Structures are given as structure tokens and as C-alpha cells.
């Protein structure tokens, strides 16, 4: 496991050296603006802390996504645009088409390509193991590309994966929380959605890396396989840790905290000591046994490894035998 972590660290360091970028360049970044008149908006698709998202149309009538950014530091806007530019051409990743500014409100809007979407929870009982393999494979290909660029998504979850069951099309969207990775750098832990947060975030480990995305995607896979979204549903961060303890055993959480010198309250430790853990096979029931195959459970167990440095990289996950059934079809 130490060798795997060392390889990952070297690879990520090489990526950063090749990119030769500095975070403080964000304030200097400027982007050529397109013509806002070239686009129109119709219905609102969603709203978030940092943006409102609309269905839009381009001049030729084709659909697009219009993401209107709320007023935030210019560095955050610049970073999101820079990341989307670096991701341009990447597989199964939402593509930046244009950047425009409203003349009256001065708001910046990102124009992104359109992707059809059906909530994954509405497809549970129709998904085959091949459907799930294709879904996971495409998201991992997107992450492999992003990580090769030194970019962490930091908010992988079903809501940020556009999926069409008719065509098995997949688009990883919403790179607003994404960040460039620099080995040894401390990052804020208030990223990702609680039910998909890795233990490193919940225990305030700030020097996390791209393996966070692997955990988040593992949570997504667990929800799909066992038809329970979200799979880890804690009421707060401490309860989220306890939900993990119920599955993995409390001692694994405690050992992880001790290894990285992370703080666990006495109350939390006392409760975790009562959890012996469960096997993934114990979640296999009549309704899900056709998709929760031994290969799927093995991939899941590797992605949902408590120690962030022992999780597979996206490339390693893509080489898992689970994908042999679709490897020549994607």
C-alpha cells in the first residue's frame, strides 16, 4: 500500500510540475467574453450556493446550459473558468462553450454543453450490471482525465453526473468546487456534500488529494448497487462518521485518526468502539443480487477504503475486473 501511495504522490507531483501553475495567478486571469445576445434562457434547472442554472438556447436553436454565477471573489470565478478550459476535450466532462457577462447586473454566466439527464434513483430496478459498469467506467474516465491535469472535482455525487439510460450517456458536471492539486498543500475541508464526504474531510485532514473523488464515487456506487441513495446518510458530520463505523468497524476509523494525528472526541471514540462492522455481502438482497456481483462488491470495497492513501487511482480502478464485461464496448 505504501508503494501505491508513493506512486500516486510522484505522479501528482509530476502533473503539477508539468502544468507549472500557481494558485495566486487566479487574480490575474482574464477571459475573452462572448456576446450575451447569442443565448436565451428558459426554465431554471437548479439553484445552488454559488450559481443559478438554466436551460438555454444558442442562436441556432440548439440546447445549452446557462450557469449564472453569483457575486463571489473574482479568483473563484477565474479558477472555475480556468479549470473548465483545462478540462476541454476531456471524456464525459461538461464542456465550456462560452463566457458572457450581463450588461446590467454584471453577472458572469458560463455557457456549457447540454446533456440529457434522468435521476439515477428512478432507474434502480431497470439497471443491469452492464449499465452500472458503463456508468462507473465513464465517470472514472472523466476523473482519470481531470486527475491527469492535476484537478480534483471535490463534489462527485449522483446529482453532478448527468445520465441518460436510453443512450448510457454520462457527463460529469459542476466543477465549481474543483481545485488544482499541489502535493503537501492544505485545502479547506468544507467541500463535497456531507453524505459523500470522505473520512479525511470529516476528520479535518486538510492535505487530502484526488483520492477524495474516488471515495465520493464509491459512495455513489454503493447507493446504486444497494438501491439506497445516499448510502451513508448522517444527520451531521459526527453522525456521518458513525454511519461509516457501522459498515467498516469503529476500530478502522480510530486507527485512521491515530495514523494521521486527527482528533476524535471521546464521545465519538466510545461510540465507535461498539461497532464491529459489516460485510458488503450482507447488503445483497433479492432485489439487488443481479447487480451486486462479487466483482462489483470488490471494486466497491477498494474505492471505499478509509485510508485515502490506500484507495486506487482512477486508472487503477478502471483496470478492475468488474469492467471486463464492457471494456470493449465503451
Task: Put a short name on every predicted segment.
Residues 105-118:
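Conserved short submotifs of the Hanks-type protein kinase catalytic core
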Residues 52-70:
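Glycine-rich ATP phosphate-binding loop
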Residues 135-136:
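Activation segment signature within eukaryotic-like protein kinase domains
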Residues 147-163:
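Catalytic-loop of the protein kinase fold
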Residues 250-301:
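C-terminal lobe substrate-recognition/regulatory segment of protein kinase catalytic domains
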Residues 89-99:
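Conserved HxN/HPN-centered segment at the entrance to the catalytic loop
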